[in-house]
Amino acid sequence: MAQQQKKRRKRKVKKCKLCEMKVEYVDYKDLRLLNEFLTDKAKIIPKRVTGNCAKHQRMIKIAIKRARHMALLPFIKL
């Protein structure tokens, strides 16, 4: 019997949105940008989903945590 060959799909390489915008610093007061990296339950979206590089993902994480501490963003949404 001939074995069937599985067709492999090439994954689309996600590019860091912040690298393309040439962002050097993610500010905790920029809520419009930070909300793009939060789920509807206010959880931080992982970098494998967003396609961010490690450097910018760390900056986003720190900025979101600072904004939460300053009560600019909620910790959870119900």
Curated annotation (Swiss-Prot):
Disulfide bonds: none
InterPro entries on file: Ribosomal_bS18, Ribosomal_bS18_CS, Ribosomal_bS18_sf
PROSITE patterns: RIBOSOMAL_S18
One Gene Ontology molecular-function label: small ribosomal subunit rRNA binding
Keyword Disulfide bond: no
Keywords: Ribonucleoprotein, Ribosomal protein, RNA-binding, rRNA-binding
Pfam family, one: Ribosomal_S18
GO annotations of cellular component type: cytosolic small ribosomal subunit
Coiled coil: none
GO BP: translation
Annotated family: Belongs to the bacterial ribosomal protein bS18 family.
NCBIfam families found in the cross-reference section: S18 (TIGR00165)
Functional description taken from the UniProt entry: Binds as a heterodimer with protein bS6 to the central domain of the 16S rRNA, where it helps stabilize the platform of the 30S subunit.
Quaternary data: Part of the 30S ribosomal subunit. Forms a tight heterodimer with protein bS6.
Protein name per Swiss-Prot or TrEMBL: Small ribosomal subunit protein bS18
Species: Pseudothermotoga lettingae (strain ATCC BAA-301 / DSM 14385 / NBRC 107922 / TMO) (Thermotoga lettingae)
Gene this protein is translated from: rpsR
